[in-house]
């Protein structure tokens, strides 16, 4: 009896040892994904916003006067950029299904960097519009394309934090661009006969080029593409075949029968996902109207603030955006009953306050500074809505690519005329129409997010499944590695049952 007990104890120790080693291996894989996937997409988005916000910083730092830009020229150039962004959105996302993302995203980064360099030679407003259009074609690969990539590597509980870090990287780029322009104007203005704003575009390119090269060499693309271990990529030295296999299997099973063909369009259109997520991000994107149209920088210029102040003060909006985005991600990842729609409704309430404050006293510096900085909270919507769409559309690869791209495309399509109608540069300092527009989109986005949650619950009930289940627990897999996982996944199974019970309980009270 003693011998048998000793044998059982030894077996338990061995199991604990195996489990511990396996857990360390999982953590190591997640670390590698963060190091080589998340790092590249964040660097790409960071320089994307350095380049993009750099245009506005150049405008208020001498470009307007040097190129004799007048009236709504800034707004028109931004609209031209948005048109290019819209045109490239869906094709870029679909290209990720045909061309390895390592190649396509790196190429697009290099291409828009080269066009940014061309901006230092512009001599007219027409040159600006032409370059900005093609810049946008390539830059449109970044935002929705990255959310597609993140959804291919990360599980539901991992997505909010990574989406928030990604969003935050763009906001850091926005802040960095303002400080960099201030420094460039101070130290390089007039050097070699070039104005400070021209030097900004040159330096932007010098930063963009190494990021494109880094992506081509180290970015692994998608876990289910054999190109991830191409001879031209260092990825084969970073991820082994077993790790790539596990990276695919740790996510929920997809419907492998779906293909990118003519059946894709009716398949996507007959579901509510495409319609509702496109609508909610049209509204959520316009909640950023005051921030995305550089209204604070224009207000500072109108009120005769110094050049350094015009470049630096708007950075506070992006700082608030970073904090609010990270806080919302932590809330959704760590709080058991947290829901995406909770954050959406909170953003709606905050943006209503912003609209009321600016409309009430648009010339009071204390009110305007407070409202503009508070408006940075709307940036949290990027991580919230796109991670939500990633989760709901995960089972259909082609649908997910189209939905994520369409969200950004329709938001851009509306913003192309919305900014002219409500946030034109000649409406400074009051932006009266913009306040009413923000009030409408803030309230509407909150309502639509509640509707999406209702549809999600109804869909989960009809499928009789948990929204997101670890694929390692799916039946029909018999390799040794996964059998070993199954021995140690009892706790995970219990958690899934608990989540399922909680999901079913929500049917009677869906908005708790």
From Swiss-Prot:
Keywords: Cell membrane, Membrane, Transmembrane, Transmembrane helix, Transport. Residues 1-27, 101-102, 154-164, 220-271, 334-342, 394-401, 456-512 are cytoplasmic. Disulfide bonds: none annotated. GO terms for molecular function: pantothenate transmembrane transporter activity. One of its GO terms (biological process) is pantothenate import across plasma membrane. It comes from Saccharomyces cerevisiae (strain ATCC 204508 / S288c). Transports pantothenate into the cell. Also involved in the catabolite repression-mediated regulation of ergosterol biosynthesis and in fenpropimorph resistance. The keyword Transport applies. SUPFAM superfamilies: MFS general substrate transporter. Its main location: membrane. The chain crosses the membrane at residues 28-48, 80-100, 103-123, 133-153, 165-185, 199-219, 272-292, 313-333, 343-363, 373-393, 402-422, 435-455. Residues 468-512 are annotated as: Disordered. It is found in: Cell membrane. Residues 49-79, 124-132, 186-198, 293-312, 364-372, 423-434 are extracellular. It is a multi-pass membrane protein. Present with 3060 molecules/cell in log phase SD medium. This is Pantothenate transporter FEN2. Residues 475-496 have a biased composition (Acidic residues). Belongs to the major facilitator superfamily. Allantoate permease family. It comes from the Eukaryota. One of its GO terms (cellular component) is cell periphery. The gene is FEN2.
């Amino acid at each position: 009896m003693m011998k048998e007990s000793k044998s059982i104890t030894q077996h338990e120790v061995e199991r604990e040892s195996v489990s511990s080693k396996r857990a360390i291996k999982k953590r190591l894989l997640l670390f590698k994904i963060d190091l080589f996937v998340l790092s590249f997409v964040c660097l790409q988005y960071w320089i994307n916003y350095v380049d993009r916000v750099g245009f506005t910083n150049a405008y208020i730092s001498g470009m307007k006067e040097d190129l004799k830009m007048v009236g709504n020229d800034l707004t028109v150039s931004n609209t031209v950029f948005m048109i290019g962004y819209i045109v490239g959105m869906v094709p870029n996302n679909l290209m990720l299904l045909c061309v390895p993302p390592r190649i396509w995203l790196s190429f697009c980064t290099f291409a828009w960097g080269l066009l940014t360099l061309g901006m230092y030679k512009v001599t007219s407003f027409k040159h600006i519009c032409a370059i900005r259009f093609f810049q946008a074609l390539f830059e449109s690969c970044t935002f929705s394309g990255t959310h597609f990539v993140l959804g291919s590597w990360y599980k539901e509980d991992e997505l909010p934090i990574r989406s928030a870090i990604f969003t935050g990287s763009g906001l850091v780029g926005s802040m960095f661009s303002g400080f960099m322009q201030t420094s460039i104007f101070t130290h390089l203005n007039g050097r070699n006969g070039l104005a400070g704003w021209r030097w900004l575009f040159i330096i932007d390119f010098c930063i963009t080029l190494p990021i494109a090269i880094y992506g081509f060499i180290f970015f692994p693309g998608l876990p289910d593409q054999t190109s991830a271990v191409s001879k031209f990529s260092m990825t084969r030295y970073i991820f082994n075949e077993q790790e790539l296999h596990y990276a695919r299997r740790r996510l929920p099973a997809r419907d492998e029968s779906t293909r990118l063909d003519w059946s894709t369009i009716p398949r996507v259109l007959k579901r509510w996902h495409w319609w509702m997520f496109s609508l909610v991000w049209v509204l959520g994107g316009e909640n950023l109207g005051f921030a995305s149209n550089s209204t604070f920088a224009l207000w500072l210029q109108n009120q005769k603030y110094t050049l350094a102040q015009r470049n630096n003060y708007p950075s506070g909006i992006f700082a608030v955006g970073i904090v609010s985005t990270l806080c919302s991600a932590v809330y959704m990842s760590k709080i058991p009953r947290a829901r995406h729609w909770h954050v959406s409704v909170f953003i709606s309430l905050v943006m209503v306050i912003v609209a009321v404050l600016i409309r009430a006293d648009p010339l009071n510096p204390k009110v305007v500074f407070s409202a503009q900085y508070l408006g940075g909270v709307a940036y949290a919507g990027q991580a919230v809505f796109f991670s939500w769409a990633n989760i709901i559309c995960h089972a259909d690869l082609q649908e997910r690519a189209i939905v994520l791209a369409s969200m950004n495309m329709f938001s851009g399509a509306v913003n192309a005329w919305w900014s002219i109608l409500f946030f034109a540069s000649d409406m400074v300092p009051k932006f009266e129409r913009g306040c009413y527009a923000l009030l409408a989109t803030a309230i509407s986005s909150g309502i639509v997010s509640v509707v999406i949650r209702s549809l999600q619950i109804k869909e989960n009930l009809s499928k009789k499944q948990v929204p997101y289940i670890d694929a390692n627990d799916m039946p029909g897999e018999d390799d040794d590695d996964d059998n070993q996982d199954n021995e140690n996944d009892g706790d995970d199974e219990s958690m899934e049952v608990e989540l399922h019970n909680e999901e079913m309980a929500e049917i009677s009270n869906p908005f708790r």
